[in-house]
């Protein structure tokens, strides 16, 4: 009823224009054209049934459009959600990958640090071993040098001792030679004196027999005295020689004992160093 009044008041082209505004589909004859598949072109009718059909179809078309838009929005929302979830998963995967790479780098750095520390310790151990070997070699060289110096010192001491002994022996020999020379000179002098006395006695015997006899007695007494003195001197010289020989023997014994003590001390020192 209301629709018939509405159609009777407004011209057909106005109503069609109004419907076209709602549906957005109008042909050149001002006929409504639905955008849905089930809507067909139809001429505008003044009848109530046709108006209701049009209204119903328009409402259905609007509902379908609204449903399509809602479905589209839901689809877009689902797509957005799906994309967001995919992006989130990609982001999480990237974060995991980043964390894994960081952990790998940290592990590699720790391994490198550990290897470097191990290499450093090995290097320090090698240097310590090298230093210990060098110190041992230096100690051995010092001990060898010390032994060589001790041996050289002992050799020098022995040479000096031999030289000193040779000098003493030469001095003793010289003294003995001088003493023998003095004894020989004394004996020669005695012989000369005896010859002179004999000659004088013979000459005096020619002059005075009594004087010769008396002088002979005096000469014999003097000769006895001189012989006693010479004998005494010879005994003193022999005693002196004996004392010098005893002193030399004692000196040689002391030198041998000193050498023996030095060898014993050297052997004891060598035994201590070996232990």
Swiss-Prot record:
Residue segments, region 12 X 16 AA tandem repeats of [KRA]-K-[KEM]-[CKA]-[AEKD]-[EA]-[ALE]-[AMK]-[FKAML]-[KQA]-[EQKA]-[KQCEM]-[ECLA]-[AEQ]-[AEQ]-[EQAKV]: 64-264
One GO process term, biological-process aspect: sperm individualization
Tissue: Testis.
Keywords: Cytoplasm, Repeat
Stretches forming Sequence repeats: 64-79, 80-95, 96-111, 112-127, 128-143, 144-159, 160-175, 181-196, 197-212, 215-230, 231-246, 249-264
Disulfide linkage: none
Highest taxon in the source lineage: Eukaryota
Claim: Translocase is one of the keywords in the record: no
GO cellular-component term (any): cytoplasm
Localisation per UniProt entry: Cytoplasm
Function: Possible structural role in the sperm tail.
Name of this protein: Axoneme-associated protein mst101(3)
């Amino acid at each position: 009823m209301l629709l018939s009044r509405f159609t009777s008041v407004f011209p057909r082209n106005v109503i069609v224009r109004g419907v076209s505004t709602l549906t957005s589909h109008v042909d050149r004859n001002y006929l409504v054209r639905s955008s849905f598949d089930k809507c067909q072109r139809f001429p505008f009718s003044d009848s109530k049934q046709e108006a209701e059909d049009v209204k119903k179809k328009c409402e259905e078309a609007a509902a379908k459009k609204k449903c399509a838009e809602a479905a589209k929005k839901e689809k877009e929302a689902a797509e957005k959600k799906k994309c967001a979830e995919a992006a989130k998963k990609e982001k999480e995967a990237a974060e995991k990958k980043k964390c894994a790479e960081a952990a790998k780098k940290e592990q590699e750095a720790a391994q490198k640090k550990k290897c470097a520390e191990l290499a450093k310790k090995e290097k320090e151990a090698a240097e310590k071993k090298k230093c210990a070997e060098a110190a041992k070699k230096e100690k051995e060289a010092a001990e060898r040098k010390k032994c060589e110096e001790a041996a050289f010192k002992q050799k020098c001491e022995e040479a000096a001792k031999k030289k000193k002994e040779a000098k003493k022996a030469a001095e003793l020999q010289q003294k003995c030679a001088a003493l023998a020379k003095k004894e020989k000179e004394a004996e020669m002098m005695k012989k000369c004196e005896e010859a002179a006395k004999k000659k004088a006695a013979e000459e005096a015997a020619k002059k005075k027999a009594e004087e010769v006899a008396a002088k002979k007695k005096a000469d014999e007494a003097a000769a006895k005295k001189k012989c006693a003195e010479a004998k005494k001197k010879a005994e003193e010289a022999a005693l002196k020689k004996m004392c010098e020989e005893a002193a030399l023997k004692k000196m040689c014994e002391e030198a041998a004992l000193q050498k023996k003590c030095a060898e014993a001390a050297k052997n004891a020192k060598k035994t201590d160093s070996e232990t």
